[in-house]
Amino acid sequence: MSTSTSRTLFPAIAASAALLLSACSTAPSTNAQAAPAASMNAGNAITGEGLENPAPNVTRNWGELPAGRKWGTTAGIDIDPKDGNVWAYERCSAGGAGGGPVDCDNTPVDPVFKFDRNTGKVLANFGKGVMVTPHGIHVDKDGNVWVTDFAANKEGTKGHQVHKFSPTGEKLMSLGIAGKPGNADGQFNQPNDVIVGPDGSIYVADGHDAQGMTTNDAIQAGLERGATSRISKFSPDGKFIKSWGKIGVRHGEFRTPHALAFDAKGRLWVADRGNHRLEIFDQDGNYLESRYQFSRVSGLFIKGDTLYAIDSESAPLNHPNWRDGVRIGPVDEDRVTAFIAPFDREDRVYQGTAGEGVAVDADGNVYAAEGPNSIVQAGGAFTKYSVK
């Protein structure tokens, strides 16, 4: 039963500054499910004050771009597990510094890049004519590159899919129905991210709109029109297995599952961006636990026993007082131990702006994929934060 739109589902979002002024305070609750009190931090997880920056040397506009091209926005970046280099994409010179709406379908350039992690030189570049709006990227243990295509073209013949490429750019598999968003089994409606699990199963985070649904009535309307906020699981050969989750605030529900990661224990982490939390599941979709100290997470990366979470969206109206940036902490605790600060931005004087995707190389250097909120301030699609 829905309630009046005047009653928000997340009163704590508007009041998070008051509720979370100390790093050990209780995180926002979700429909009477209280978040556990976080462990005491050495600094402040909200502002980043008093926290170490492990990668203080900033290289803006990192990575080479072919002659004649301008950087477009991005949201995804990953590390090749075979050689340690960097995979990412840019949206065909559009959506940010390049200007214009994102439309890789009608822009004859290759959006997917492999960069040398030391020099930024292009090692591979492909994907022309396959996607409309790339969103998430993942490199599996065999070096295959997976990319989600977030939106459809005008003709309804491309988009709302997940594509698997070989390391040289051969398209090996596509999931979803080309150009047809929906909530049926095996279908996608704005797929955000993709990851391959330890046994080769494929997991897709699907549904982007729900983060703006802040009332029960808005959520109900979204469900009625077929909007999704779920995780879909497929076999290694692409057969649909199951989905779990819907738009909501309870555990196992999401308001925009924006990014995915696996830890060394084989647990699946979901950045539930609209609910300002991380949700952790086993590989069958059973809820295990949550994290609340890492803010409004857009991108995730787990390296060993360390979690890196990047916040690109916290702003005065959706998450007061929380600064954008990269929060770093131990996988097994809800505790932030380090922080990489955001870029300055005039309309977010206190909170700043940071990228959407994050990855970390073998040396501990951190890479950010700059989205529409940050690409102008960053000066390019990718930023490298070096340890030395």
Kindly give the residue locations of the regions a language model identified.
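Bacterial N-terminal signal peptides that target proteins for export
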Residues: S2-I13
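Residue-level signal for mature regions of secreted extracellular proteins and peptides
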Residues: A17-A18
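C-terminal motif of bacterial Sec signal peptides marking the signal peptidase cleavage site
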Residues: L21-A23
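Bacterial signal peptide processing site
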Residues: S25-A27
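Eukaryotic scaffold repeat domains enriched in small/polar residues
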Residues: Q33-K388
